[in-house]
From Swiss-Prot:
Gene Ontology biological process: mRNA processing; RNA splicing; tRNA processing
Protein family (similarity comment): Belongs to the intron maturase 2 family. MatK subfamily.
Protein name: Maturase K
Record's keyword annotation contains Nucleotide-binding: no
Cited function: Usually encoded in the trnK tRNA gene intron. Probably assists in splicing its own and other chloroplast group II introns.
Keyword ATP-binding: no
UniProt subcellular location: Plastid, Chloroplast
GO cellular component: chloroplast
Recorded superkingdom: Eukaryota
Amino acid sequence: MEELQGYLEIDGFRQHHFLYPLLLQEYIYALAHDHGLNGSILSEPMENLSHDNKSSSLIVKRLITRMHQQNHFIISVNDSNQKGFVGHNKNFHSQKISEGFAVIVEIPFSLQLVSSLEEKEIAKFHNSRSIHSIFPFFEDKLSHLNHVSDILIPYPIHLEILVQTLRCWIQDAPSLHLLRFFLHEYWNSNSLITPKKSISFFSKENQRLFLFLYNSHVYECESVFIFLRKQSSHLRSTSFGSFLERTHFYGKIEHLVVVLGNDFPKTLWLFKDPFVHYVRYQGKSILASRGTQFLIKKWKYHLVNFWQCHFYLWSQPDRIHLNQLCNHSFYFLGYLSSVQLNSSVVRSQMLENAFLMDTAIKKFETIVPIIPLIGSLAKAKFCNGSGHPISKPFRTDLSDSEILNRFGRICKNLSHYHSGSSKKQSLYRIKFILRLSCARTLSRKHKSTVRAFLKRLGSELLEEFLTEEEQVLSLIFPRTPSHRPHRERIWYLDIICINDLANHE
């Protein structure tokens, strides 16, 4: 990272913002390979990087040599005899360079992110990254709101929009041309499929580059919330991250202020209610408001028009659902969340008169949807479609302890992620399915019956599926007759990604 930062701080980069020369450096491809598709380029020092046979130094050197010798990327269609850069082993070379390019475009933002964290002294940055940190926010805010909107952020209708979005952040024209080449290369090779499937295919082949492009696209779509929030509050809000500090961003805000202030004086009034909250994970977002149905419909109208006019995105009406919180449950991050009205009867006595008061209290509830979760288990071959446990095929060379540990780890991960559920009955059923599926798998391996195997294994099978929170729950909460441990919710601040089995979307 010191070597990268040294290049970025030289006069040539500061004056011209050139990123493409980094494509000719071998360590870029080592970073792209060794840190994986989901890794961070800031997690390990340079000396810890290594190579394997597939991404050897010799292959990278040959690739760099071809880039030095090649004068252009795009080969003429009429000249079929040319063996240019993409003429020989095109897919492999394109994938390698796109992986390296993904690392390069992340560098300026990563350095700004590190500097902003050091300046703000954010010590609990990893806690704020946790998915579970969203649900305490829901508990605190949603019980006071009236309406909720489920929003699916639309995909860009053309890949050129992604390039135009990055023009505000990256002022290196050759790098933008190279990005445009990659996008059109994958688009042309999959021209017979829809744009959404094309983007999905692109994400599977070059996940790191796609995630960077998609996050930049989503951030642009969300820029309207930042602007409206700043206009509706006297205190200027400070957003986390380095994406706000980009070229022309504040210029755009000032321009929008002038336009809305002069031409649409009543528009900002619609958004001055401070009780509007917005939460997003991946491509799905939740917009909740305390206002009336009219206000939330105005939000929908302005969002659709903003996306269509500013980003040329066609947002279908069924991608934004408007519902009342008291009558609607929304699915988000593997939980089915809702706001329930719980009545509380209080007896009051004044002098000789006594009367009962029925008070309705709003409470935020989160439950685990059992049907989608059973569908995920059935897809992974732990049970059939009706939830009946079946034996899962494993390699014959695996020992009993390895099979037992794998089942136990899956069960603990699911229980760990869904520990915030208000009702634990669904989790008990999932654990029963996994436990019996494990017993069927082991009994099938030993050609025995499930009853005999469970009798022989005994408490060892039960302890393997017992989670840590169940072991310490009795120490945290007192044992009283009114205590109901199946309703206690526990949120963890170390979960930064959703479990594959828990993600039913």
